[in-house]
């Protein structure tokens, strides 16, 4: 009986239907980018200092310049690493004293300014920015700076818990229903976040968005990879992820045009309501329908694909089914990912790779945001470098395979982080170049692990397998903001050292996975178990006997 891949070879693996579905679903990938890394602009922290109403009043009376007013409000920045005093402390002075002069009011209070008492910024901060961010609106600086880390960690926590539920939902009730449900919740929560009256409500809507947005992205990814044959799967998988890069570039332009975070949030959220139109544009996955014994519906969709591609349905289409496996369970469960020793080993390796790739990818972005000279240009450069990374992945996957390029890309990312440790912060241009090299390497690794992860699991548990393994990427995303911002306070190079170790180790364990180049998607547990397994010597012997016996009988 023919499989889905057999039928696709006859009706078209990458025909008009697949191209149309690909372009439509790529919009989901592009829309996911502002959610995933939007913190760079939504949570931008500009230069700031304490606000002092007393100094402002005296400045107005004395006609001071802004620089003079700042000089009498906060202590100087001093050596590197002591900027905290200027941003989070101010002079505790009674500015209503009549003895204060306009020339040097602090001189009459102390001969040395270091003897003046310092206090917290009780009256807020003054931010040096023409726009606004969640940092400037909710004062997420100084003692509350960790709340910005929590904002991004909360999103990744939503990714983590949502991945398991959405993945199970997609395998149990279908890819299409999962896609539409997550689109609706994601759009509504994104708009509500733009109208958040306080930090806690904003955090709640961000968590809700995290619970569904990654599942929405993965549902689209799974659909497009299941619509095409094995010959086109590698291309559409990487191009789908390249659409994420297009979303990053578009985000840069939107952030530059809309410097106020609420307008930016609305601009990236409102258009996602249009994805509900996919109800009429995208069919259910025939592979999933077959795994649920809904053969009639799967045959109908395959017939639709044939018509869209201008092909006649093959004569054996009505015999379409999955290969029989008496041990197969149609209802996916977490235990299926660990049922055999081979699957168990692969699952653990994939989990570590997802964790490492997430920490390095988000870590490099946040590190760039914390050390950037021009935030918009630096973000744009680091986003554009993902495009050649995608083409490198396409070329190497076609000619070399998945495993060796993925190992080399992790090695490149880890080595880049190691090199950045020894580059002076004053050489900003060199830091950006090395960071872009590392960003390209980790981008290639992420593109490939998405492809490899989907290729190592059978159909009935594929979506759950991708979701569970990629949940380690969310754990990495939860801790990455704290790694970047909190460890930098201990030692600026400490996050980069950790990134380098993780990347170099990931390069080694990648080599333990089987190659999947040119191999059809496994449809049963037996297919998945046999990936990378060589033929037994006994089978080879029988084959040789058959070949040698034929000539003697003629």
From Swiss-Prot:
Subcellular localization: Basolateral cell membrane; Apical cell membrane; Lateral cell membrane; Basal cell membrane
Catalytic activity: 1-methylnicotinamide(out) = 1-methylnicotinamide(in); dopamine(out) = dopamine(in); serotonin(out) = serotonin(in); (R)-adrenaline(out) = (R)-adrenaline(in)
Keywords recorded for this protein, A-Z: Cell membrane, Glycoprotein, Ion transport, Membrane, Phosphoprotein, Transmembrane, Transmembrane helix, Transport
Effect of mutating residue 32 to L: No change in fenoterol uptake. Decreased trospium uptake. Decreased trospium affinity
Tissues expressing the protein: Widely expressed with high level in liver. In liver, expressed around the central vein. Expressed in kidney. Expressed in small intestine enterocytes. Localized to peritubular myoid cells, Leydig cells and moderately to the basal membrane of Sertoli cells in testes. Expressed in tracheal and bronchial ciliated epithelium in the respiratory tract. Also expressed in skeletal muscle, stomach, spleen, heart, placentacolon, brain, granulycytes and lympohocytes.
Bilayer disposition of the protein: Multi-pass membrane protein
Thermal profile of function: Optimum temperature is 22 degrees Celsius for the transport of TEA. Doesn't show any transport activity of TEA at 4 degrees Celsius.
GO cellular component: apical plasma membrane; basal plasma membrane; basolateral plasma membrane; lateral plasma membrane; membrane; plasma membrane; presynapse
Single Gene Ontology MF annotation: putrescine transmembrane transporter activity
Description of what induces expression: In the liver activated by HNF4A and suppressed by bile acids via NR0B2. Increased by cholesterol treatment in hepatocyte cells.
Glycosites: 71
GO term, biological process aspect, one: metanephric proximal tubule development
Effect the entry attributes to changing residue 28 to I: No change in fenoterol uptake. No change in trospium uptake. No change in terbutaline uptake
Key word Transmembrane helix present: yes
Effect of residue 189 to L: No changes in MPP(+) uptake
Residue positions where Phosphoserine is found in the record: 333
Modes of activity regulation: Phosphorylation of the transporter leads to changes in its substrate affinity, resulting in a regulation of the transport activity. In contrast with rat ortholog, ASP uptake is inhibited by protein kinase A (PKA) and C (PKC) activation. ASP uptake is also endogenously activated by calmodulin, the calmodulin-dependent kinase II and LCK tyrosine kinase. Inhibited by cGMP, most likely through a cGMP-binding protein that interacts with OCT1.
InterPro entries: MFS_dom, MFS_sugar_transport-like, MFS_trans_sf, Orgcat_transp/SVOP, Sugar_transporter_CS
Consequence of substituting residue 488 to M: No changes in MPP(+) uptake
Function: Electrogenic voltage-dependent transporter that mediates the transport of a variety of organic cations such as endogenous bioactive amines, cationic drugs and xenobiotics. Functions as a pH- and Na(+)-independent, bidirectional transporter. Cation cellular uptake or release is driven by the electrochemical potential (i.e. membrane potential and concentration gradient) and substrate selectivity. Hydrophobicity is a major requirement for recognition in polyvalent substrates and inhibitors.
Free-text comment about domains: A large substrate binding region with partially overlapping binding domains for structurally different substrates is formed by several transmembrane helix domains (TMH) including TMH 2, 4, 10 and 11, and it is alternatingly exposed to the extracellular or intracellular side during substrate transport. Amino acids in TMH 1 confer major functional differences between human and mouse orthologs.
Protein's UniProt name: Solute carrier family 22 member 1
Name of the gene encoding the protein in the UniProt record: SLC22A1
């Amino acid at each position: 009986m023919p499989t889905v891949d057999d039928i696709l070879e006859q009706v078209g693996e990458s025909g008009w239907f697949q191209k149309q579905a690909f372009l439509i679903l790529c919009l989901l990938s592009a829309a996911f980018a502002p959610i995933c890394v939007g913190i760079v602009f939504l949570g931008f922290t500009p230069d700031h200092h304490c606000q002092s109403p007393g100094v402002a009043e005296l400045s107005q009376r004395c006609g001071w310049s802004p620089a003079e007013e700042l000089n009498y409000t906060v202590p100087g920045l001093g050596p590197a690493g002591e900027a905290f005093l200027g941003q989070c402390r101010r002079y505790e002075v009674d500015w209503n004293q009549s003895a204060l002069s306009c020339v040097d009011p602090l001189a009459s209070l102390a001969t040395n300014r270091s003897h003046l008492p310092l206090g917290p910024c009780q009256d807020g901060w003054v931010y040096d920015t023409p726009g606004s961010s969640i940092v400037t609106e909710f004062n997420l600086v100084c003692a509350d700076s960790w709340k910005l880390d929590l904002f991004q960690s909360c999103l990744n926590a939503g990714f983590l818990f949502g991945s398991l539920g959405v993945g199970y939902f997609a395998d149990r009730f279908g890819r299409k229903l999962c896609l539409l449900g997550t689109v609706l919740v994601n759009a509504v929560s994104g708009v509500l976040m733009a109208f958040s009256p306080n930090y806690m409500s904003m955090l709640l809507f961000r968590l809700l968005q995290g619970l569904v947005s990654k599942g929405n992205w993965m549902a689209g990814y799974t659909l497009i990879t299941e619509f095409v044959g094995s010959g086109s799967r590698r291309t559409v998988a990487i191009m789908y992820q390249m659409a994420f890069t297009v979303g990053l570039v578009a985000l840069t332009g939107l952030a530059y045009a809309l410097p106020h975070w609420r307008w930016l949030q609305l601009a990236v959220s409102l258009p996602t309501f249009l994805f509900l139109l996919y109800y009429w544009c995208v069919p259910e996955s025939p592979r999933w329908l077959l795994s649920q014994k809904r053969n009639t519906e799967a045959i109908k969709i395959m017939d639709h694909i044939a018509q869209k591609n201008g092909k006649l349905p093959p004569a054996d289409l009505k015999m379409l089914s999955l290969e029989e496996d008496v041990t197969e369970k149609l209802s996916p469960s977490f235990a299926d990912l660990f049922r055999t020793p081979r699957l168990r080993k692969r699952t653990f390796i994939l989990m570590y790779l997802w964790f490492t790739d997430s920490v390095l990818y988000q870590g490099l972005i946040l590190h760039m945001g914390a050390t950037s000279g021009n935030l918009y240009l630096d973000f744009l450069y680091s986003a554009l470098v993902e495009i050649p990374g995608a083409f490198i992945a396409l070329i190497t996957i076609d000619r070399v395979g998945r495993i060796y390029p993925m190992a080399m890309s992790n090695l490149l990312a880890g080595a880049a982080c190691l090199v950045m440790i020894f580059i002076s912060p004053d050489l900003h241009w060199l830091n950006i170049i090395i960071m872009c090299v590392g960003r390209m390497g980790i981008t290639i690794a992420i593109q490939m692990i998405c492809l490899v992860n989907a290729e190592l699991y059978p159909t009935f548990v594929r979506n759950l397998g991708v979701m569970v393994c990629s949940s380690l990427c969310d754990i990495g995303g939860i801790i990455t903001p704290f790694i970047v911002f909190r460890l930098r306070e201990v030692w600026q190079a400490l996050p980069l050292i950790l990134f380098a170790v993780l990347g170099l180790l990931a390069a080694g364990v990648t080599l333990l996975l089987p190659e999947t180049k040119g191999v059809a998607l496994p449809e049963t547990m037996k297919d998945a178990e046999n990936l990378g397994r060589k033929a037994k010597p006994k089978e080879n012997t029988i084959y040789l006997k058959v070949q040698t016996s034929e000539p003697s009988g003629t």
